[in-house]
């Protein structure tokens, strides 16, 4: 009976069986983890033009770092003559999606109820999404690709299963640590069946991957805890193709100093801590404007907080498509995030030549060298943030020095050429071995 199970995936069923105290055994498939011979991964290799599939479980295009990463990588690879296809669930027919969803839901409910006596709504809904996405990916001829690049753990699981037949180099880039972040914010509970389920998917994504490309070194430790080998992980910091707008000089005293925050208005971005910090230093903000760029679920709450704290200098601009222009007029960029990987907005601010204040979440300390290219704080510490703001408001020389250093760092390390070149050489190494 066990051997007949193909969906849910046998390894998921085995993990859930273990959680519920059932005995089961599924034959283990040996997945090759052979790596290219040791050499500098960023030296020039083959000039072959590759055919590459970049795939994500999430909607694309969309606002945010993941969508930008995919667009940037695809654009850079195409500029070098490579063929790139991008696949995401929202590209498929809504009628077909509905049909698949309706067909699998009762089967999943029946399977989980018969086997475990009940089912988790979260797991049921997720398995339904996985099933639909897998059915869509089944229609694609993977044989025509030289390289497969999954942008999340779910796509890595699906492509990994298919790749048992095709044996293509499969790269995996996590854009966040899925289970860890959901535990941190109480979206799922510690020691729950949901934790067991998602951790198994994360571990299997690592097992299926020929190589893991991470956005920052902050991913290494949690990935290694899930079973990754350090030698199978390469850090490639995100680069962007940033429009070079000349900075707006503010020579006269009548010009206000501009502080800008570009971020989705959500609970993880820490706008409330920025507002608290501003309330501590009101006497230093008489000739200052604070621009809040972005929109989201927290807007009404933040507008009430602004009013309650008497922060007349704060202006909500909503979503904007002229962020580079806004940043070119910005003196201090602030991102008080309490949970992040490698924020695109910081990279944009550094390219614009703006002094940056942010927190030590994720890979941010790999972008901001404290007191050199900006200031790094503890997340959620409004007093530290107030002190940093006051320092840069009062100290023009420090602002200018950090701005210059940030721009120089971005021009050297955070470009599309740097990012794409490193990833392309990894692709080439694995393609040549394959």
PLM features per residue range, with description:
Residues 370-371, 375-382, 391-397:
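Conserved acidic donor-binding segment of nucleotide-sugar-dependent glycosyltransferases
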Residues 150-155, 174:
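Short His-centered aromatic/hydrophobic patch
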Residues 319, 338:
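Aromatic "clamp/platform" in nucleotide-sugar-dependent glycosyltransferases that forms part
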Residues 384, 391, 398-412, 419-425:
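A short, well-ordered alpha-helix in the C-terminal region of glycosyltransferases
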Residues 355-358:
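Short hydrophobic beta-strand element within catalytic cores of glycosyltransferases
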Residues 178, 192-211:
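Membrane-proximal helix-turn-helix segments that form the acceptor-binding/catalytic region
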Residues 218, 239:
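Carbohydrate-associated surface elements
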Residues 252-269, 275-278:
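Conserved donor-binding/catalytic core segment of Leloir-type glycosyltransferases
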């Amino acid at each position: 009976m066990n051997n007949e199970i193909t969906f849910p995936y046998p390894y998921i069923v085995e993990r859930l069986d273990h959680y519920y105290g059932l005995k089961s055994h599924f034959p283990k498939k040996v997945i090759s983890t052979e790596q290219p011979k040791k050499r500098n991964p960023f030296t020039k290799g083959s000039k072959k033009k590759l055919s590459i599939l970049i795939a994500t479980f999430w909607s694309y295009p969309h606002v945010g770092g993941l969508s930008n990463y995919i667009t940037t990588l695809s654009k850079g690879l195409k500029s070098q003559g490579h063929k790139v296809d991008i696949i995401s669930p929202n590209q498929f027919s809504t009628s077909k999606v509905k049909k698949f969803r309706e067909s699998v839901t009762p089967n999943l409910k029946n399977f989980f109820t018969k086997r475990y006596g009940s089912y988790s709504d979260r797991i049921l809904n997720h398995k339904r999404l996985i099933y639909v996405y897998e059915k869509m990916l089944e229609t694609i001829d993977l044989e025509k690709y030289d390289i497969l690049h999954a942008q999340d753990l779910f796509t890595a699981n699906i492509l990994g299963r298919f790749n048992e037949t095709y044996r293509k180099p499969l790269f995996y880039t996590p854009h966040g640590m899925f289970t860890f972040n959901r535990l941190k914010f109480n979206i799922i509970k510690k020691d729950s069946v949901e934790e067991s389920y998602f951790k198994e998917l994360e571990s299997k994504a690592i097992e299926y991957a020929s190589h893991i490309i991470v956005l920052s070194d902050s991913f290494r430790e949690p990935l290694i805890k899930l079973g990754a080998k350090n030698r199978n992980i390469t850090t490639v910091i995100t680069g962007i193709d940033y429009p070079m707008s000349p900075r707006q000089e503010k020579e006269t005293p009548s010009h206000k100093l501009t502080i800008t925050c570009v971020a989705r208005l959500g609970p993880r971005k820490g706008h409330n801590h920025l507002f608290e910090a501003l309330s501590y230093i009101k006497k230093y903000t008489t000739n200052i404007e604070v621009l809040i760029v972005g929109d989201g679920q927290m807007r009404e709450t933040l507008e009430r907080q602004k009013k309650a704290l008497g922060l007349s200098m704060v202006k909500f601009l909503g979503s904007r498509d002229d962020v580079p222009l806004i940043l070119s007029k910005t003196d201090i960029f602030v991102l008080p995030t309490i949970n992040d990987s490698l924020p695109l907005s910081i990279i944009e601010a550094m390219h614009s030549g703006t002094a940056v204040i942010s927190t030590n979440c994720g890979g941010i300390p790999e972008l901001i060298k404290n007191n050199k290219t900006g200031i790094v704080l503890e997340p959620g510490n409004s007093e530290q943030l107030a002190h940093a703001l006051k320092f840069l408001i009062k100290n023009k020389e420090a602002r200018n020095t950090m701005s210059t250093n940030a721009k120089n760092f971005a021009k050297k390390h955070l470009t599309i050429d740097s990012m794409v070149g490193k990833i392309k050489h990894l692709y080439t190494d694995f393609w040549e071995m394959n």
